[in-house]
Amino acid sequence: MDQAGSSVEPEARYFESDGASYPNNPNLPVLIYRGIFNSNKGSIADQFEESFRRNRWTGCWRWSVYDFHHHHSNAHEALGVSQGHARLQLGGPQGEAFDVSAGALIVLPAGTGHKKLHSSTDFLVVGAYPNGQGHYDTNRCGSLDYDQALANIAATPLPNTDPVYGSEGPLVRIWG
């Protein structure tokens, strides 16, 4: 196991396509890990960044989540909640809302619609992508041909590692 300690088993959620603008991922579930890190070991943002780097998830950024529905058809995305709390809509407009707070990790397979519904003022996310997927697209409703989105999703390689737990982590087992 990696430095995060014994692994937290994620909640796995599948979302169906709307058949038009939000393909979601026909084969892979969203993974929601809760309580991955806490502030007892320093900055949660720093812990996520170190873990992502160690496990070859690259292109790290710190910010929030867009407040409009969007998806990335050519990259998987890890969102490490580092501060505050939020309600996120996953799966596009027909999806489901989830409450997340500091220490949670959401891993979105390519094509999964997502947006921020509301958040605390201090809400902060560290985002990252599997090695080689840092040049991702951002698609809003109807901005990418649906068939092209499906082709991009199918062509997006699986990551070799879980963003926190490495090559033996839950993502590798569940998505593998």
PLM features: residue spans?
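Short, conserved beta-strand element in jelly-roll/cupin
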Residues: H72-Q89, V107
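Double-stranded beta-helix
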Residues: L117-G176
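A generic structural motif
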Residues: Q89-G91, L117
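A short beta-loop-beta micro-motif enriched in histidine and acidic residues
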Residues: S64-A78, P93-Q94, V100-A102
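A short, N-terminal "cap"/entry segment at the start of jelly-roll beta-barrel domains
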Residues: M1-H70, L171-G176
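Conserved metal-binding segment of the jelly-roll/cupin
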Residues: V100-S120, Y129
